[in-house]
Amino acid sequence: MAEIHTMHNTKAGRVFDVCNILFLGGVGAITILPFLYIIAGSFATEAELAQRSFFIFPKTFTLDAYKYVFSTPTFLRSMGVSIFITVVGTAVQLFFTFTMAYPLAKRHVKGRNLLLNLVIFSMLFSGGMIPTYLVVKSLGLLDTYWALILPMAINPFNLIIIKNFFQQLPRELEESAKIDGCSEIGVFWRIALPLSKPVIATFALFYAVGIWNDFFHALLYINDSAKWPLQMVLRQVTILSDLTATNGDTMQNAVPPEQGIKLAVIVIATLPILAVYPFLQKHFAKGMLIGSVKG
Protein backbone atom coordinates (compact mmCIF):
# COMPACT_ATOMS: atom_id res chain seq x y z
CA MET A 1 0.00 0.00 0.00
CA ALA A 2 2.86 2.35 0.82
CA GLU A 3 4.46 1.72 -2.58
CA ILE A 4 1.19 2.48 -4.39
CA HIS A 5 0.70 5.66 -2.36
CA THR A 6 4.27 6.76 -3.14
CA MET A 7 3.82 6.09 -6.86
CA HIS A 8 0.76 8.37 -7.02
CA ASN A 9 2.71 11.15 -5.27
CA THR A 10 5.58 11.04 -7.76
CA LYS A 11 5.69 13.09 -10.93
CA ALA A 12 5.29 10.01 -13.13
CA GLY A 13 2.28 8.94 -11.10
CA ARG A 14 0.61 12.34 -11.45
CA VAL A 15 1.29 12.38 -15.21
CA PHE A 16 -0.27 8.92 -15.48
CA ASP A 17 -3.35 10.08 -13.55
CA VAL A 18 -3.78 13.11 -15.81
CA CYS A 19 -3.39 11.03 -18.98
CA ASN A 20 -5.82 8.45 -17.62
CA ILE A 21 -8.41 11.13 -16.84
CA LEU A 22 -7.99 12.74 -20.27
CA PHE A 23 -8.29 9.39 -22.03
CA LEU A 24 -11.40 8.32 -20.13
CA GLY A 25 -12.90 11.79 -20.58
CA GLY A 26 -12.31 11.56 -24.33
CA VAL A 27 -13.92 8.13 -24.51
CA GLY A 28 -16.87 9.43 -22.50
CA ALA A 29 -17.27 12.43 -24.81
CA ILE A 30 -17.13 10.23 -27.92
CA THR A 31 -19.85 8.06 -26.38
CA ILE A 32 -22.15 10.84 -25.16
CA LEU A 33 -21.89 13.43 -27.94
CA PRO A 34 -23.81 11.38 -30.56
CA PHE A 35 -26.71 11.03 -28.13
CA LEU A 36 -26.68 14.75 -27.41
CA TYR A 37 -26.64 15.46 -31.15
CA ILE A 38 -29.64 13.18 -31.71
CA ILE A 39 -31.60 14.78 -28.86
CA ALA A 40 -30.79 18.30 -30.08
CA GLY A 41 -31.66 17.38 -33.66
CA SER A 42 -35.07 16.08 -32.63
CA PHE A 43 -35.91 19.59 -31.36
CA ALA A 44 -34.35 21.47 -34.30
CA THR A 45 -36.07 22.98 -37.34
CA GLU A 46 -35.81 21.70 -40.90
CA ALA A 47 -33.42 24.46 -41.92
CA GLU A 48 -31.03 23.72 -39.05
CA LEU A 49 -31.08 20.01 -39.82
CA ALA A 50 -30.39 20.63 -43.50
CA GLN A 51 -27.53 23.07 -42.79
CA ARG A 52 -26.29 21.21 -39.67
CA SER A 53 -25.99 24.61 -38.03
CA PHE A 54 -26.36 23.32 -34.46
CA PHE A 55 -24.34 21.09 -32.18
CA ILE A 56 -25.65 20.42 -28.67
CA PHE A 57 -28.42 23.03 -28.53
CA PRO A 58 -30.69 23.93 -31.48
CA LYS A 59 -30.95 27.61 -32.31
CA THR A 60 -34.72 27.38 -32.74
CA PHE A 61 -36.53 25.04 -30.36
CA THR A 62 -39.52 23.18 -31.86
CA LEU A 63 -41.66 20.19 -30.88
CA ASP A 64 -43.08 19.60 -34.36
CA ALA A 65 -41.38 16.23 -34.81
CA TYR A 66 -42.68 14.93 -31.47
CA LYS A 67 -46.17 16.31 -32.15
CA TYR A 68 -46.23 14.45 -35.44
CA VAL A 69 -45.09 11.17 -33.89
CA PHE A 70 -47.45 11.36 -30.90
CA SER A 71 -50.36 12.36 -33.14
CA THR A 72 -50.06 9.07 -35.02
CA PRO A 73 -53.36 7.26 -34.23
CA THR A 74 -51.78 3.93 -33.29
CA PHE A 75 -48.88 5.36 -31.28
CA LEU A 76 -50.29 5.09 -27.74
CA ARG A 77 -51.77 1.66 -28.42
CA SER A 78 -48.47 0.39 -29.79
CA MET A 79 -46.69 1.79 -26.74
CA GLY A 80 -48.98 -0.28 -24.52
CA VAL A 81 -48.38 -3.36 -26.68
CA SER A 82 -44.61 -2.95 -26.41
CA ILE A 83 -44.75 -2.49 -22.65
CA PHE A 84 -46.90 -5.61 -22.28
CA ILE A 85 -44.69 -7.71 -24.55
CA THR A 86 -41.51 -6.49 -22.87
CA VAL A 87 -42.72 -7.14 -19.31
CA VAL A 88 -44.36 -10.51 -20.02
CA GLY A 89 -41.65 -11.62 -22.46
CA THR A 90 -38.85 -10.78 -20.03
CA ALA A 91 -40.62 -12.65 -17.21
CA VAL A 92 -41.22 -15.69 -19.46
CA GLN A 93 -37.63 -15.78 -20.68
CA LEU A 94 -36.22 -15.44 -17.17
CA PHE A 95 -38.54 -18.16 -15.82
CA PHE A 96 -37.79 -20.73 -18.51
CA THR A 97 -34.07 -19.97 -18.68
CA PHE A 98 -33.46 -20.20 -14.93
CA THR A 99 -35.70 -23.21 -14.33
CA MET A 100 -33.94 -25.08 -17.14
CA ALA A 101 -30.41 -23.95 -16.22
CA TYR A 102 -30.67 -25.10 -12.59
CA PRO A 103 -31.23 -28.85 -13.22
CA LEU A 104 -28.63 -28.79 -16.01
CA ALA A 105 -26.12 -27.60 -13.40
CA LYS A 106 -26.72 -30.73 -11.28
CA ARG A 107 -24.45 -33.61 -12.24
CA HIS A 108 -26.76 -36.24 -10.73
CA VAL A 109 -29.69 -35.37 -13.04
CA LYS A 110 -30.26 -38.17 -15.55
CA GLY A 111 -30.14 -37.16 -19.21
CA ARG A 112 -28.42 -33.92 -18.33
CA ASN A 113 -25.62 -34.28 -20.89
CA LEU A 114 -28.02 -35.23 -23.68
CA LEU A 115 -30.24 -32.24 -23.01
CA LEU A 116 -27.23 -29.94 -22.77
CA ASN A 117 -25.94 -31.20 -26.12
CA LEU A 118 -29.35 -30.54 -27.67
CA VAL A 119 -29.22 -26.99 -26.33
CA ILE A 120 -25.77 -26.45 -27.83
CA PHE A 121 -26.93 -28.01 -31.12
CA SER A 122 -29.89 -25.62 -31.30
CA MET A 123 -27.51 -22.72 -30.73
CA LEU A 124 -25.20 -23.79 -33.57
CA PHE A 125 -27.88 -24.93 -36.02
CA SER A 126 -31.09 -22.93 -35.77
CA GLY A 127 -34.33 -24.00 -37.42
CA GLY A 128 -34.37 -21.08 -39.82
CA MET A 129 -36.94 -18.41 -40.53
CA ILE A 130 -39.39 -20.37 -42.71
CA PRO A 131 -39.56 -23.52 -40.53
CA THR A 132 -40.02 -21.35 -37.45
CA TYR A 133 -42.81 -19.44 -39.19
CA LEU A 134 -44.54 -22.72 -40.10
CA VAL A 135 -44.30 -23.90 -36.48
CA VAL A 136 -45.75 -20.62 -35.20
CA LYS A 137 -48.55 -20.88 -37.76
CA SER A 138 -49.33 -24.52 -36.92
CA LEU A 139 -49.60 -23.59 -33.23
CA GLY A 140 -52.14 -20.88 -34.07
CA LEU A 141 -49.94 -18.09 -32.74
CA LEU A 142 -50.05 -15.84 -35.81
CA ASP A 143 -51.50 -12.40 -35.07
CA THR A 144 -51.21 -12.99 -31.32
CA TYR A 145 -48.88 -11.42 -28.77
CA TRP A 146 -47.56 -14.89 -27.89
CA ALA A 147 -45.94 -15.09 -31.33
CA LEU A 148 -43.61 -12.33 -30.12
CA ILE A 149 -42.88 -14.07 -26.80
CA LEU A 150 -42.84 -17.88 -26.98
CA PRO A 151 -40.47 -18.42 -29.96
CA MET A 152 -37.78 -16.51 -28.03
CA ALA A 153 -38.56 -18.02 -24.62
CA ILE A 154 -35.11 -19.58 -24.16
CA ASN A 155 -31.76 -18.23 -25.32
CA PRO A 156 -29.28 -21.16 -25.48
CA PHE A 157 -26.21 -18.98 -24.95
CA ASN A 158 -27.66 -17.28 -21.87
CA LEU A 159 -28.84 -20.66 -20.61
CA ILE A 160 -25.28 -22.01 -20.65
CA ILE A 161 -23.94 -18.94 -18.83
CA ILE A 162 -26.57 -19.22 -16.10
CA LYS A 163 -25.92 -22.97 -15.80
CA ASN A 164 -22.23 -22.24 -15.18
CA PHE A 165 -23.21 -19.70 -12.53
CA PHE A 166 -25.33 -22.26 -10.68
CA GLN A 167 -22.45 -24.74 -10.82
CA GLN A 168 -20.24 -22.24 -8.98
CA LEU A 169 -22.59 -21.93 -6.01
CA PRO A 170 -21.13 -23.64 -2.91
CA ARG A 171 -22.51 -27.14 -2.46
CA GLU A 172 -22.44 -26.61 1.30
CA LEU A 173 -25.39 -24.23 1.00
CA GLU A 174 -27.47 -26.85 -0.77
CA GLU A 175 -26.48 -29.58 1.68
CA SER A 176 -27.30 -27.39 4.69
CA ALA A 177 -30.71 -26.54 3.25
CA LYS A 178 -31.49 -30.20 2.62
CA ILE A 179 -30.47 -31.10 6.17
CA ASP A 180 -33.02 -28.53 7.36
CA GLY A 181 -35.69 -30.35 5.33
CA CYS A 182 -35.63 -28.28 2.13
CA SER A 183 -36.53 -30.05 -1.12
CA GLU A 184 -34.71 -29.56 -4.41
CA ILE A 185 -37.33 -27.05 -5.53
CA GLY A 186 -37.06 -25.30 -2.16
CA VAL A 187 -33.29 -25.02 -2.56
CA PHE A 188 -33.83 -23.42 -5.97
CA TRP A 189 -36.43 -20.88 -4.80
CA ARG A 190 -34.99 -20.09 -1.35
CA ILE A 191 -31.23 -20.41 -1.88
CA ALA A 192 -30.22 -20.30 -5.55
CA LEU A 193 -32.55 -17.55 -6.79
CA PRO A 194 -31.88 -15.06 -3.94
CA LEU A 195 -28.16 -15.46 -4.62
CA SER A 196 -28.82 -14.85 -8.31
CA LYS A 197 -30.19 -11.31 -8.04
CA PRO A 198 -27.28 -9.72 -9.97
CA VAL A 199 -27.62 -12.39 -12.65
CA ILE A 200 -31.39 -11.93 -12.87
CA ALA A 201 -31.02 -8.15 -13.15
CA THR A 202 -28.36 -8.46 -15.86
CA PHE A 203 -30.28 -10.86 -18.05
CA ALA A 204 -33.56 -9.06 -17.40
CA LEU A 205 -31.97 -5.95 -18.90
CA PHE A 206 -30.60 -7.92 -21.86
CA TYR A 207 -33.96 -9.57 -22.53
CA ALA A 208 -35.93 -6.34 -22.10
CA VAL A 209 -33.68 -4.42 -24.51
CA GLY A 210 -33.90 -7.21 -27.08
CA ILE A 211 -37.70 -7.44 -26.91
CA TRP A 212 -38.22 -3.67 -26.85
CA ASN A 213 -36.06 -3.08 -29.93
CA ASP A 214 -37.37 -6.05 -31.92
CA PHE A 215 -39.58 -5.35 -34.92
CA PHE A 216 -38.52 -8.22 -37.19
CA HIS A 217 -40.68 -10.84 -35.46
CA ALA A 218 -43.67 -8.50 -35.53
CA LEU A 219 -43.03 -8.01 -39.23
CA LEU A 220 -43.17 -11.79 -39.70
CA TYR A 221 -45.99 -12.84 -37.39
CA ILE A 222 -48.31 -9.84 -36.89
CA ASN A 223 -50.55 -8.69 -39.73
CA ASP A 224 -53.09 -6.83 -37.59
CA SER A 225 -51.86 -3.24 -37.22
CA ALA A 226 -53.78 -2.94 -33.94
CA LYS A 227 -51.31 -5.44 -32.43
CA TRP A 228 -48.14 -3.85 -33.74
CA PRO A 229 -45.48 -3.02 -31.13
CA LEU A 230 -43.96 0.43 -30.91
CA GLN A 231 -41.00 -0.35 -33.16
CA MET A 232 -43.29 -1.32 -36.04
CA VAL A 233 -45.33 1.86 -35.71
CA LEU A 234 -42.21 4.01 -35.51
CA ARG A 235 -40.90 2.24 -38.60
CA GLN A 236 -44.12 3.10 -40.44
CA VAL A 237 -43.90 6.72 -39.27
CA THR A 238 -40.37 6.95 -40.64
CA ILE A 239 -41.39 5.41 -43.98
CA LEU A 240 -44.35 7.77 -44.32
CA SER A 241 -42.20 10.79 -43.52
CA ASP A 242 -39.73 9.68 -46.21
CA LEU A 243 -42.53 9.39 -48.76
CA THR A 244 -43.94 12.78 -47.80
CA ALA A 245 -40.54 14.41 -48.08
CA THR A 246 -40.02 12.78 -51.48
CA ASN A 247 -43.33 14.22 -52.71
CA GLY A 248 -42.29 17.69 -51.58
CA ASP A 249 -44.99 18.13 -48.93
CA THR A 250 -42.43 18.98 -46.27
CA MET A 251 -41.51 22.21 -47.99
CA GLN A 252 -45.18 23.20 -47.81
CA ASN A 253 -45.14 22.68 -44.02
CA ALA A 254 -47.54 19.73 -44.27
CA VAL A 255 -45.36 17.66 -41.95
CA PRO A 256 -42.28 18.29 -39.84
CA PRO A 257 -38.80 17.68 -41.25
CA GLU A 258 -38.01 14.15 -42.32
CA GLN A 259 -34.77 13.97 -40.33
CA GLY A 260 -36.40 15.49 -37.26
CA ILE A 261 -38.98 12.70 -37.20
CA LYS A 262 -36.26 10.05 -37.44
CA LEU A 263 -34.32 11.60 -34.57
CA ALA A 264 -37.46 11.96 -32.46
CA VAL A 265 -38.25 8.29 -33.10
CA ILE A 266 -34.77 7.30 -31.89
CA VAL A 267 -35.21 9.33 -28.69
CA ILE A 268 -38.67 7.89 -27.99
CA ALA A 269 -37.50 4.32 -28.57
CA THR A 270 -34.41 4.75 -26.37
CA LEU A 271 -35.79 6.63 -23.35
CA PRO A 272 -37.65 3.71 -21.67
CA ILE A 273 -34.53 1.54 -21.57
CA LEU A 274 -32.41 4.45 -20.34
CA ALA A 275 -34.97 5.05 -17.59
CA VAL A 276 -34.80 1.42 -16.41
CA TYR A 277 -31.01 1.04 -16.42
CA PRO A 278 -30.23 3.20 -13.32
CA PHE A 279 -32.42 0.96 -11.15
CA LEU A 280 -30.50 -2.15 -12.28
CA GLN A 281 -27.04 -0.61 -12.38
CA LYS A 282 -25.80 -1.89 -9.00
CA HIS A 283 -26.79 -5.44 -9.92
CA PHE A 284 -25.66 -5.09 -13.53
CA ALA A 285 -22.00 -4.52 -12.62
CA LYS A 286 -21.96 -7.69 -10.49
CA GLY A 287 -23.81 -9.74 -13.08
CA MET A 288 -21.27 -8.87 -15.78
CA LEU A 289 -18.64 -10.80 -13.76
CA ILE A 290 -20.53 -14.11 -14.00
CA GLY A 291 -18.08 -16.96 -14.36
CA SER A 292 -14.98 -14.75 -14.23
CA VAL A 293 -14.03 -15.54 -10.62
CA LYS A 294 -14.18 -18.90 -8.89
CA GLY A 295 -13.73 -19.81 -5.26
From Swiss-Prot:
InterPro entries referenced in this protein's UniProt entry, alphabetically: MetI-like, MetI-like_sf
Cited SUPFAM superfamilies: MetI-like
Domain called ABC transmembrane type-1: residue spans: 79-280
Major localization listed first in the record, in broad terms: membrane
GO CC terms: plasma membrane
Location of the protein in the cell: Cell membrane
Transmembrane regions listed in the UniProt entry: 21-41, 81-101, 116-136, 142-162, 199-219, 260-280
CDD domains: TM_PBP2
Biological process, per Gene Ontology: transmembrane transport
Membrane topology per record: Multi-pass membrane protein
PROSITE patterns in the record: ABC_TM1
Keywords, comma-separated and alphabetical: Cell membrane, Membrane, Transmembrane, Transmembrane helix, Transport
Family affiliation: Belongs to the binding-protein-dependent transport system permease family. CysTW subfamily.
Protein name per UniProt: Protein LplC
Organism: Bacillus subtilis (strain 168)
